[in-house]
């Protein structure tokens, strides 16, 4: 199987952590769309949003998704990539989409423990726990709509990877 694997889900669900380890295990290339975009523009996501607003960032995110999609690649996407209909169809039609699902409490704990998350601009201007709750309520149905596979991401990365591998084996053998 050489189809790209798209990891989707909210901030803090483990897309980058799981994606890097999964790519290594499957001998695939790993790309994080946010990191790729930041390296291309030599700007942080916050700087891009400040300069171009969220609409400009979302347009660049779509271009990044198209640019990094290639066979034998694990792609960790930005949490809001599913907000654009084109992106949802593109991922569904060009690879296998894995939704790393986790409850608000887990996401908030992970985000509070990750100092680099302070570099991300707020989506709502609200306290973190309220923002995560609101954003997840808005996006969960979209994540589920686009996903070929839904994985409980509350477990340790090694367990999440094991569950992804099992689900991929079942998907391929259908």
Curated annotation (Swiss-Prot):
Principal location: cytoplasm
Cofactor annotation comment: Binds 1 Mg(2+) ion per subunit.
Gene3D superfamilies: P-loop containing nucleotide triphosphate hydrolases
Domain of life: Bacteria
Known pathway: Metabolic intermediate biosynthesis; chorismate biosynthesis; chorismate from D-erythrose 4-phosphate and phosphoenolpyruvate: step 5/7
Binding site for Mg(2+): 16, 32
Region (LID domain): 112-126
Function, as annotated: Catalyzes the specific phosphorylation of the 3-hydroxyl group of shikimic acid using ATP as a cosubstrate.
Comment field on protein domains: The LID domain closes over the active site upon ATP binding.
UniProt protein name: Shikimate kinase 2
Organism: Shigella dysenteriae serotype 1 (strain Sd197)
């Amino acid at each position: 199987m050489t189809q790209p694997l798209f990891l989707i889900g909210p901030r803090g669900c483990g897309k980058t952590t799981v994606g890097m380890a999964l790519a290594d295990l499957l001998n695939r290339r790993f790309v994080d769309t946010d990191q790729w975009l930041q390296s291309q523009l030599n700007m942080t996501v916050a700087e891009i949003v400040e300069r171009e607003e969220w609409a400009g960032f979302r347009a660049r995110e779509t271009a990044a998704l198209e640019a990094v999609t290639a066979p034998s690649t694990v792609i960790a996407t930005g949490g809001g990539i599913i907000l654009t209909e084109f992106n949802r169809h593109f991922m569904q039609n060009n690879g296998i989409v894995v939704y790393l699902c986790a409850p608000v409490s887990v996401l908030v704990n992970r985000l509070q423990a990750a100092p680099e998350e302070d570099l991300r601009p707020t989506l709502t201007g609200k306290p973190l726990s309220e923002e995560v709750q609101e954003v997840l309520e808005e996006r969960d149905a979209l994540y589920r709509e686009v996903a070929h596979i839904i994985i409980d991401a509350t477990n340790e990365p090694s367990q999440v990877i094991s569950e992804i591998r099992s689900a991929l084996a079942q998907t391929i053998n259908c």
